[in-house]
Amino acid sequence: MNMLFSLISEPFAYPFMQRAIVAAIVTGVVCAILSCYLVLKGWSLMGDAISHAVLPGIVLAFWLGIPLVIGAFVSGIFCAVATGYLKENSRVKEDTVMGIVFSGMFAFGLVLFSRIDTDQHLSHILFGNMLGISLTELKQTLWIAGFTLLVVLLKRKDFMLYCFDPNHARVIGLPVKFLHYGLLCLLALTIVASLQAVGVILVIAMLIAPGIIAFMICRSFDQMLVVATLVSVVACVLGTLISFHIDGATGPCIVIIQALFFVVALIYNHIKPIKDRKMAPLTKAVNPENTAPSNLP
């Protein structure tokens, strides 16, 4: 027990680990909340596209001497808008357009990076460097994540209805176009906030895994938000602590933990129906008047 306590408490003695844990929790919360909407909307590939497309914006921002988050955000929004325009003005399907746009922008970013002299490691951009996050970068992450969470919470029901049934949202008078591009902007902001933690490649796992895990084991969207947040925060904290002890990359450790949680949820999702079928005759015998299935909101 003392050894376990030492393993958990030892990293907190270092200031860089304190910053890393705070960044992990904040990143985990904002990614988990947004992942529920992405899973409900079916935008897994959109998150992947924008996360890869921010690379040229980061490189150009560094070259111009402006904050990297501005370049990343503009680049991500350009990818989303270009994808929507090409989809609406051509016969090509959306997933095909996204594949071409994000791969082209990612390749363009790699070429730009190879032509610019910088002491910045490409691996830190691609895979993140949470243990090396500075106080300024942490404050930046907190501001972006806080703004994103505030907007999502204020428009929670509107976004939920838009993701679940955009036609119904349009019929009742919701600004569907505004919600569409608003969600894209929030997605781009979330990716920017997560860059320091897991980089442009692995951020898609944090934007999908918590939501799909919660989707498999929950019966309502509110439950889904809570479970996704818990899963994401636990995975981020555990991954950060494990990376400290094994001297490994933080981003991949976090994603591995989330992948393990997904396997557990998948097994639970297969076992629960079997258990319910076995318990059904016993439940009916004990309480024959209350055998109707429940419909949770």
Curated annotation (Swiss-Prot):
Q: Which Pfam families does the entry mention?
A: ABC-3
The alphabetized UniProt keywords are: Cell inner membrane, Cell membrane, Ion transport, Iron, Iron transport, Membrane, Transmembrane, Transmembrane helix, Transport
Q: Which GO terms describe its cellular component?
A: ATP-binding cassette (ABC) transporter complex; plasma membrane
Question: Where does it localize?
Answer: Cell inner membrane
The superkingdom listed in its UniProt entry is: Bacteria
Organism field? Yersinia pestis
The reply on keyword Transport is: yes
Q: Per its database record, what is this protein's job?
A: Part of an ATP-driven transport system YfeABCD for chelated iron.
Question: Which biological process annotations from GO are given for this protein?
Answer: cellular response to iron ion; iron ion transport; response to zinc ion; transmembrane transport
Q: What is this protein called?
A: Chelated iron transport system membrane protein YfeD
Question: What family does this belong to?
Answer: Belongs to the ABC-3 integral membrane protein family.
Q: Membrane-spanning residues where? A: 20-40, 58-78, 96-116, 133-153, 172-192, 197-217, 224-244, 248-268
The record's annotation in CDD domains points to: TM_ABC_iron-siderophores_like (cd06550)
Look up keyword Repressor and say if it applies. no
Spell out the InterPro entries in the cross-references. Answer: ABC_BtuC-like, ABC_TroCD
Read off the SUPFAM superfamilies from this record: ABC transporter involved in vitamin B12 uptake, BtuC
Q: Note the topology in the membrane.
A: Multi-pass membrane protein
